[in-house]
């Protein structure tokens, strides 16, 4: 009976098939918006061909990740595929414009090319779209091209309660090492959209080294808002672990590992936490399974 329970536990973790959680490409977007592009890429690629995936949106974020990694050829291909999937998803046009701004040719000429993409993206009703104007502002900012403030103003005018606007303001302040003011902007984002997952995550990251209790409280608040979010679950587990709350960390990791969008690379952490919690049999069974797939795992 004991062995059967161990086996059930192991299969439960490995497959995630006994869970009510549903895999979704939006988990990848949440990781990207929270500043974790590498994890975002894994999930966006994993869910790309799922029935519920908006491919145009997924390709856009894959393009953004490639841009961050300075793989501009891949970024161009992703934006192109995004437009092929849905020509009306204008963010991919903005991605192409950002690539133009990043060109090494004459700056004046590259700006003219970029402006054509941006003008096309803002045609018709899109002209007053807060998200599209903000994406253009980011394109200017991320390429070091003057002019991002103009599109920030347009974004704010279109929607004064747009949470992504405040998130970007916060990110700019972080780059300027104005962390207190940045947290204020993240709080604004939460105020206008309590479901703004990335705001909770970024806020907690800033505060953890200063006030881990406050950071953990913010993530616990997030659990009530988005209990099925993969990043919310993982961040909660990691925060407990970093704060040496190993029993809570193990429980949080067990919940997270039931999510189809968990990462197999997190399983050694759970095995360690089970050991710390004196759940030796479960820890051993999980460790054996990990080693059967990864004999060189240095943690195990």
Model-derived features with residue positions:
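Register position in tetratricopeptide repeats
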Residues: 33-34, 68, 95, 102-104, ...
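Residue-level recognition of tetratricopeptide repeat
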Residues: 54-55, 89, 128-129, 162, ...
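Structural marker of alpha-solenoid helical repeat scaffolds
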Residues: 50-51, 85, 123-125, 157-158, ...
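TPR alpha-solenoid repeat register
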Residues: 58, 92, 130-132, 165, ...
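N-terminal leader/linker segments that initiate helical-solenoid repeat arrays
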Residues: 18-80, 84-95, 101-112, 119, ...
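Canonical tetratricopeptide repeat
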Residues: 60-61, 95-96, 131-135, 168, ...
């Amino acid at each position: 009976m004991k062995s059967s329970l161990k086996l059930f536990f192991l299969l439960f973790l490995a497959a995630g098939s006994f869970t009510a959680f549903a895999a979704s490409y939006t988990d990848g977007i949440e990781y990207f918006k929270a500043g974790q592009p590498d994890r975002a890429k894994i999930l966006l690629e994993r869910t790309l061909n799922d029935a519920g995936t908006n491919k145009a949106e997924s390709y856009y974020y894959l393009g953004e990740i490639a841009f961050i990694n300075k793989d501009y050829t891949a970024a161009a291909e992703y934006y192109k595929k995004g437009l092929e999937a849905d020509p009306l998803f204008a963010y991919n046009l903005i991605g192409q414009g950002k690539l133009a701004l990043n060109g090494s040719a004459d700056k004046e000429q590259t700006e003219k090319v970029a402006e054509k993409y941006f003008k096309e993206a803002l045609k018709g009703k899109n002209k007053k779209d807060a998200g599209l104007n903000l994406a253009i502002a980011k394109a200017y900012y991320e390429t070091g091209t003057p002019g991002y403030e103009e599109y920030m103003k347009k974004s704010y005018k279109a929607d004064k309660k747009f949470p992504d606007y405040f998130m970007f303001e916060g990110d700019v302040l972080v780059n300027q090492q104005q962390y207190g003011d940045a947290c204020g902007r993240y709080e604004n984002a939460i105020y206008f959209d309590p479901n703004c997952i990335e705001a909770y995550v970024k806020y907690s990251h800033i505060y953890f080294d200063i006030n881990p209790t406050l950071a953990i409280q913010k993530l616990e608040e997030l659990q009530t808002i988005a209990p099925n979010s993969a990043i919310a679950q993982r961040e909660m587990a990691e925060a407990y672990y970093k704060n040496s709350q190993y029993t809570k960390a193990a429980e949080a990791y067990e919940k997270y590992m039931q999510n189809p969008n968990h990462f197999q690379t997190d399983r050694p952490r759970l095995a360690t936490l089970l050991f710390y919690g004196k759940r030796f049999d479960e820890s051993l069974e999980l460790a054996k399974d990990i080693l059967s797939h990864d004999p060189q795992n240095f943690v195990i």
